[in-house]
Curated annotation (Swiss-Prot):
Residues 915-939 are annotated as: Endonuclease domain. Keywords: ATP-binding, DNA-binding, Endonuclease, Helicase, Hydrolase, Nuclease, Nucleotide-binding, Restriction system, S-adenosyl-L-methionine. NCBIfam families: PRK15483.1 (NF012027). Contains two different subunits: Res and Mod. A type III restriction enzyme that recognizes 2 inversely oriented double-stranded sequences 5'-CGAAG-3' and cleaves 25-27 base pairs downstream. After binding to one recognition site undergoes random one-dimensional diffusion along DNA until it collides with a stationary enzyme bound to the second DNA site, which is when DNA cleavage occurs. DNA restriction requires both the Res and Mod subunits. Residues 886-974 form the VRR-NUC domain. It holds the Pfam family RE_endonuc. It catalyses: Endonucleolytic cleavage of DNA to give specific double-stranded fragments with terminal 5'-phosphates. One of its GO terms (cellular component) is cytosol. The gene is res. This is Type III restriction-modification enzyme BceSI Res subunit. Residues 50-545 are annotated as: Helicase-like domain. InterPro entries: Helicase/UvrB_N (IPR006935), Helicase_Restrict-Modif_Enz (IPR050742), P-loop_NTPase (IPR027417), RE_endonuc_C (IPR045572), VRR_NUC (IPR014883). It comes from Bacillus cereus (strain ATCC 10987 / NRS 248).
Amino acid sequence: MKILLEELPHQEESLKAILENFTGIDNAANDSDVDYVYANPLIRGRYNEISNIDVKMETGTGKTYVYTRLMYEMHQQYGIFKFVIVVPSPAIKEGAKNFIQSDYAKQHFSQFYENVRIELNVINAGDFKSKSGRRNFPAQLLNFVEGSRQNSNTIEVLLINADMLRSKSMRNNDYDQTLIGGTTSPIEAIQDTRPVVIIDEPHRFPRDKANYQSIEAIKPQVIIRFGATFPEVTTGKGSNKITKKDYYRKKPQFDLNAIESFNNGLVKGIDIYYPNLTEEQAKNRYVVDSVKAKELVLKQNSKSWILHVGDNLAEVDSGFEGDIEYAGSKMLSNELELEKGMTLIPGTYRSTYQELIIKDAIDKHFEIEQANFLRANQRENNVPRIKTLSLFFIDSITSYRQDDGWLKATFERLLKEKLSRLVAEYEFKRLPREKEYLEFLRATQSSLASDNQNVHAGYFGEDRGSGDESIQAEVDDILKNKEKLLSFKDENGNWQTRRFLFSKWTLREGWDNPNVFVIAKLRTSGSDNSKIQEVGRGLRLPVDETGHRIQQDEWPTRLAFLIGYDEKDFAQKLIGEINSDAKLQLNEEKLTEDMIQLIVTKRKKVNPEFTDERLLEHLDNLGIINRKNEFKESIDIGGVQKSGFEWLVELYPELNTNRLREGKVIDTKKHSIKVRVKLRKENWEKVKELWQQFSNRYMLEFQRIPETISFMAEQIVGNHSLYEREVPMQMKESLHASDDNESVVLREQENEYQRIYLPGMAYGKFVKRINIATGIPIKEIHANLFKLMKSSLKGDARYLSELSLNNIIREFKKRFDEIFAQAYEYKKLDFQARTAIYNPEMDSFVDDINAEVIGVNIDEQAQEDNRYLYELPPMRYDSVTPERDLLRHGYNDKVTVFGKLPRRAIQVPKYTGGSTTPDFIYMIEKDNDSSVYVLVETKAENMRLEDQRIIDIQKKFFDTLKEHHIEFIEATSAQQVYSIIRKLSEE
């Protein structure tokens, strides 16, 4: 298989934000080295902190993709070709290297940047070792420094970790070699390239520490930081002490935080599991009373125990199994970092308890694996399978690597037992996909029983440089052969059964595999560790066996995270950490001005007349707030008691965008929030006739408009008014203190140069980019552009600018919509396919569906109505107006079925690509024993052009199904829907 990288909207938005905030090239520079071919062009505002850029992206959302594409984009737009990527550790360096050098990444980027390649130069420990008595520079450093801009198709990238960058090898200047520019110092040589620096994981590079200072030493013109977290700075003391994130421009230029990532389905949901202890075991706990480099003091009630380096914790309590010792330097031998006040529970160290976690992890793995493998499980036309991987974090390498190691023996015993039960179950299954799964299980059994099993593998820090070929093969599979791990079969058709991985913390950073669905922690990580980072290896959305990335609305996925009882508050801490990342912190005591503005801004999109006065009046009338806008403690509305803040969030769920939605992270021991909603089958059966039609596949047949493409090419590519020469800007910069004297701001004034224009693109490149963006054949583009260049443009290649390109693309999209918006019809094909809720092969509806494809907000107070499409409560909806209003309404008896449709329930094809589904369905019984089906698409009054297109598309499609008594309506308010339903009921 090959992983297929796709352009995701949030990644495109990130790239756009970076380029919008980039200061551009300084075409007015008087520097004598401005045209130095071994260095980047001079950047406006270079070496100035305010020109630097911060990009905040949550773990698992693709920051490596973004900064890799950014390098291609800056090379294409600005001619910048020398980048230094600085990472905090060798593990992250390996991860970045694997992505940039992967075939799938190169193939993906080649479609946008033809004939351009990244020359990745990686500096590793040992590269500076002298050979034959001579101290030479590493070849990778030479390649980077001596790369010339005259090689216009190559981007030179130096990838280095922090320790290496600040090492003596980089600072020394006594090498037996002189680089271009006359220097013998690696640091000075990099300085001469005038690099753009990309920092990965900026929280590991606080600006007052050595790691960051080593970056400043190479004198980057601009620094761009990418990370989920950023370093903090503290000012003041005592009650005046303030700690805040240290951003270059006081806030990130792109901010995709944890809340948005989870709420918008950009990462997996999380389920937290842990086996319970007996009451006696749970109460038996020891507190770290003090911990020093050579001494640990544990306390239980009034009794204390002093342990020195090398002392075994079993001397304190036999429950501490596994030869756990105090290793010194505030760490146990299992690498658990200790701090005063920590609690240690011996029961969680017992082998029987560890075995429980392993058993639960295996059970959870196969529960998820069966769902991912079978998926639709039809007789034919099955969707691609998804490989399921599990990751175990363990204490001891010997317990896994040794043939008789306890962990390995226990895991294999439990796995064999589980496989035997599953094989016995699937021997009686008959569907094709079920038979395939039986083959997969039997292949797993065979491999596990062989001398060289290929079912599980481990990677540990101690494995680096191991001479054991079998271990090295395991390590290579885990670190480098991502596509092999994600594949079900090799090129010879043999099953790839490896899917259980073991590590200490070596795989905690830098490594990722999107198909990790289970993480089991057989070791505690300590209280200071980032909880998001711990689950981070399993957050990425998975890919199927074709390499396609699976979005949450297509196939909802969750990470099963198994921990010990001693971390049972993990879910609460994780939710707290996610919510602390909110752009706006919700005040549960008082309605703040920021909260008011958030509600008003979002409501205005639906109702332009909504104001802050209207909001406050509504809350005041309900008694939710007092005259100081403080929330009242307990309010009774409709017989339900809640705090003022709780009522505010229910009435105005727009605020939920600033906190993690319920069900995204679940502690399975405490909560049973429904992540799936059961269908009321009896109601869906009443509308089955419709879905028998909706499951038919349709193709779009465009009208053959004579010479359309030639006409568009002539009207757009041949339109001289769309061509502009780009004028360089002269930027005058001056530094000024801010009004509060706490910061320095850069004030800029741009002036156009008179009669000076920037050079344009190469002719072939300009033609190719139009072709990629519009689909107009190259032959047509060339014919019209060549003619225009000879006539109106007088052969002036400066007109082949980015401005001209953007004008052409914008005009093409406008003309395409004008010509083809109604110039097509739907043609029914002779086959059917599943929708999100209906299986035509079985002629039946699914039992349940992912709750969030119905709606992201929850109404626990919804009244039971046996005509509704789903079991209640809770009721799911997306917007208060009109969605929640429509769902809460008491309809007349003629309405026999109603409800909100899940996404992809119908899948009306769009001429712009993709599909769309209306929001609501109503079934109305008439007096003459006939029925009418009302499909409703709800939109805001001030709808966007794209929303209007969707309405037009749906109307056109449903008009072809009029014979099935379908009425399609668009509505901007609940009253419109009530009125139409009332009218249809009376006819």
